């Protein structure tokens, strides 16, 4: 059950909308007013909770028109990525809960089937909507149900190959699938690539007449040309299709309609009604929208307001917490310095330039920076190609998005043992975006790959060391680091002063006799604090910073394991096949069967959204959780409140 926020009653149109049935009774003027009230609700809420503001503001009229025309939830709406679904949530019975958006145990920021029948398909990653809606369309056809499935996909998501695989299949099946192309010329960062340039070709009437006149003149010079002209004269639209985006989608056997003003409710409703009632086969409606529509700061800087924390709604100024630099910032600064020292280093992003900290590198070395769009598979193999010719590519992608490129990592990078560095940002739980964005599987799905070295820094200084080590290593490497601030340790501004790490060598931070704490990455400092508290209770703990998930420092770990007879591993990753599993495998290989062990990490489940600290506490990987696990392993009791994260 969602928490229901306490809200003050207001006499607005929005207060009278509890389901899409209510908006179908409204007049044109009412819909205009309602759109403004929805924007007000979204801006007011997101300014407090944070969230995906600009994408949701851009599709308010489109959302109203879709629910006005289609019989949802019987007709199925599939929102690609899902970060633009706020108006959809407000209109489908969740208005009173909207103030709990992205709050712990509150409303998800993405479509959730368990949250509402109107959320037909769960999304969070890009480019899945057309495939899902096509599957729904086929299922309805097989079940003899006369309903529609509508995919709403942004032009940014159309840069991914999966979208075109679905278009190709849909054209072959020739079913009544409806695709809405929400074209705002943005994914998160501004769109890149030939497709984006193609979609942006909107010829004026004057330009069209000039092109047509010139083409007619040339074609009239031959019999073949005259035959072509006869065909073109049959339809002005056919002529225009040579020069507009429609030709691309018509090649996939879609009926193309558009471009249409995505903020003109009348035009949207009229077009959707026509397509719903007359389409025979797949149809694509090209809708032009403005990301951030209705809130000037978001319109002027849609990248900054794509996914935003709390902000001052009057000024648009983002409320930033004071504290240490983030791991992402340190990564970006170090990449900038590495690029200065080594001309063979190139950086690759998948439509997340600012999010991965690569903006400074992209500005300083534009010829060595590549934003490939939402195309993680291509990013990895593109990097492999660069590496095969002597370059040192660093690919910066969020942990949860690396899942999309598993085959490329294995087949194109690790089998040929190429020097590609995988910078795994947002490793571990990320907070309010929830299970589609948590990075709690990367240790598990990367650890089994031969040739791949995997590292995790305990702090921002060690991140620098690992990045320098990785870019100089003759083989594939991965560095996983978390979302958020570092440990406020000093970092180096000079690459030459950053030490290169010995592959597979950890460090003994504290030596004890009773128990070995073996944390990885961002769990090292909580483990050190736990060891200090345990010492106050007479328990002597060793603490190792492994640095390397693969290969493990077998000598150091086994030496301390034999000495203490007890091990607790701690990781910001799922328990299944993670770092703890690797340690157990090591003990088995070394025939150390008498060691008592306890593995701490996230459960074998999809972790819901919530503050990072809360999620760490729930999984027992804070200082307090480590202390409790140690006492349990030692079969002692004490006050559990002795330490907190």
UniProtKB/Swiss-Prot annotation:
Classification via InterPro entries: Dxylulose-5-P_synthase, THDP-binding, Transketo_C/PFOR_II, Transketolase-like_Pyr-bd, Transketolase_BS, Transketolase_C, Transketolase_CS
Cofactor: Mg(2+); thiamine diphosphate
Protein name per its UniProtKB record: 1-deoxy-D-xylulose-5-phosphate synthase
EC number, UniProt record: 2.2.1.7
Lineage: Bacteria, Pseudomonadati, Thermodesulfobacteriota, Desulfobulbia, Desulfobulbales
Pfam entry (one): Transketolase_C
Molecular-function GO term, any one: magnesium ion binding
Protein encoded by which gene: dxs
Any one biological process term the GO annotation gives: isopentenyl diphosphate biosynthetic process, methylerythritol 4-phosphate pathway
Domain of life the protein comes from: Bacteria
Description of how the protein assembles with itself and partners: Homodimer.
Similarity section: Belongs to the transketolase family. DXPS subfamily.
UniProt cross-references to PROSITE patterns, sorted A to Z: TRANSKETOLASE_1, TRANSKETOLASE_2
